[in-house]
Amino acid sequence: VGGNLKAQTIVKHQIGFDIRPGYVAPTNSFLEGDNARQKTIDQSLSLHLKYAFRFNKDSRLGRLYPHAYQGIGVSYNTFHSPAELGNPVVVYAFQGAPIVQLSPLLSFDYEWNFGASFGWKKYDGLYNPQNEVIGSKINAYINLGFILNWQLHPQWKLAAGVDFTHFSNGNTHYPNGGLNVIGGRVG
């Protein structure tokens, strides 16, 4: 019983780091250059630090979800316009798994992230009147990524892919155009 119980509780821990450059979709005139800098806001960069775990393959959950991983992450984001948008920090939960195993060392995976972003420069009628994209200092963060995952060594992976991100306050404050990013990721 002791050995079986031990197998039920052991998890595999992972630490990861992602760099995600992105293209900001021009959803309104503020992003197209109708802002204080009179320049398009069309680039983003985010740096992610993630902790993940997966269940032991011999546990009940490990047998149900043998390749799934889940965890928490934190990221720093810039849109190269700190005076009008800020440089938000995101805290999020994530989950991912292979969609298809392409070879013994290469898989095509998905990963979703969901959390809260803090540190935005929100719309202000006097001090930030052109920013109709972000209406609150705290916004939801939603991300979906598709990744090629290459197992370099039993302890090391290299991942590269594309992802789609949406920042929004869910219409709790206006204006709320939201911010959409289409990007790449390496980690």
Question: Where would I find each of the regions flagged by the language model?
Answer:
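Short loop/turn motifs that connect adjacent beta-strands in outer-membrane beta-barrel proteins
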Residues: 8-12, 56-68, 83, 100-108, ...
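Short glycine/proline- and aromatic-enriched beta-strand/turn motifs that initiate or cap beta-hairpins
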Residues: 8-54, 187
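Residues that define the transmembrane beta-barrel architecture of outer-membrane proteins
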Residues: 11, 41-47, 85-91, 136-142, ...
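Membrane-embedded beta-strand positions of outer-membrane beta-barrel proteins
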Residues: 15-19, 70-72, 110-114, 144-146, ...
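Predominantly the C-terminal beta-signal and adjacent terminal strand-loop region
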Residues: 28, 147, 151-187
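Extracellular loop and loop/strand-boundary signature of outer-membrane beta-barrel proteins
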Residues: 33-37, 79-82, 128-134, 169-176
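Gram-negative (and chloroplast) outer-membrane scaffold detector with strong preference
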Residues: 65-118
